[in-house]
Amino acid sequence: MQKNITKISDTEQELEIILSAEEFGTEYNQELEEAKRTVQIKGFRKGHVPAGMIKKLVGPAIEASIAEKMASKHFSAIADEENIKPASRAAIESFSFDDNQLSIKLSYEIHPEFELKGFEGYTFTQPRYTITDEDVQKEINLILKGHGTLISIDDAASATDTVIGDVVKLNAEGEAEEGSAMENHHFNLEYLPEENPFRSALTGKKAGEIADVTTEPKDEETPAQIYRITVKEVKRLELPELTDELVKEISGQRFEHAADFTSDVRLQLEQHFTMKSEDELLESISAKLIEENPVSAPKTMIASFANMLVENAKRQMGGNFPKGFDAGQFEQAMAPNAEKHARWLLISQKIAEINNLSVTDDDIRAFAEKEAEKNPTLSVEEAISTYMSTEFRDYITDSILKDKVYDIIKSQVTITEEPTPIPVRQN
């Protein structure tokens, strides 16, 4: 067997495999004999069609089948011998049977070879979110909203109130357009964007007052729209007191006392923002290493990440994109992000390779024990059994390896903490 490897690009190669008749003859003759037994031609008894006629009729199909078998048989061995790291399945570009030899040309993508820049001198800032009593109370208030009562008030509307009013659309002369009236329209100001003209105009208004609202045109050809709102009522959400009885109802009997519920809210906030802090640090690290190591990513790998991002978006929208959604344009918009994911995977793999990182059964058991601690309904034995299973093992192994890679990076860079207030939640 002869083999010739041609570099097409940093991520693409071609492999030519040349086999002698002795190396593919057995398989070829087996398929030819099978064809002799099964091919039927008028005028010949089954199994007695001349070999020359068989070759003329089904020879091309046999040759294609043999080329596929020989490519599958030899590619993996050659990849191991030549230290090729395929990033895609090898595809047959062409093949030929000449002078008792078979030549097969394969194309495939590879993981590129590159030198990883040292990152020991890098410095990163990690936000350290501080949870205040006010933050805890705001979170509790959000929970209590589902148990609150809307009450009518005489005060001017605040940015969190609901304004009820009659709406008409005005024409250029300032007169009401026929058929445009809407009675008792509810404006929940809290859920309107701050720059929304209706929110701006209605904040500060009382029952009986009038507000004129001008909306910005969508384009130069569309005129601005003017609406007149006669405020009929302003309502404010009155929150209930956080009592032990209400806590039992809200928590499904998990907590009996308001103090315990409040402590749990604080704990949940602390855990959430600890994870957020870590995620933001890791995002900064990956962005820096991607910037400093402009490695080319295989198209197959980028396409895989693009598909993952699209499927994630579909799940967030209930399983499918809404009618009229331009999926093609969305995929194009996701392409740069998919390429970053692919490049970061290559960099992570390089760090793991340099540091001889691997994942053992003991690592998976330790991971399962930590996860079981977080979930009281999951026993350690169940977690270990699940994570060791064929269905989950690769995913868990990948997660653990990522953590090991990040630990290596964090041990060699400088990380400074910056006290940071938690961001205001957008309703």
Curated annotation (Swiss-Prot):
GO terms for cellular component: cytoplasm. InterPro entries: PPIase_dom_sf (IPR046357), Trig_fac (IPR005215), Trigger_fac_C (IPR008880), Trigger_fac_C_sf (IPR037041), Trigger_fac_ribosome-bd_bac (IPR008881), Trigger_fac_ribosome-bd_sf (IPR036611), Trigger_fact/SurA_dom_sf (IPR027304). Keywords: Cell cycle, Cell division, Chaperone, Cytoplasm, Isomerase, Rotamase. It is found in: Cytoplasm. Its EC number is 5.2.1.8. GO terms for biological process: cell division; protein folding; protein transport. It catalyses: [protein]-peptidylproline (omega=180) = [protein]-peptidylproline (omega=0). The keyword Transferase does not apply. Involved in protein export. Acts as a chaperone by maintaining the newly synthesized protein in an open conformation. Functions as a peptidyl-prolyl cis-trans isomerase. Consists of 3 domains; the N-terminus binds the ribosome, the middle domain has PPIase activity, while the C-terminus has intrinsic chaperone activity on its own. This is Trigger factor. It comes from Chlorobium limicola (strain DSM 245 / NBRC 103803 / 6330). The gene is tig.
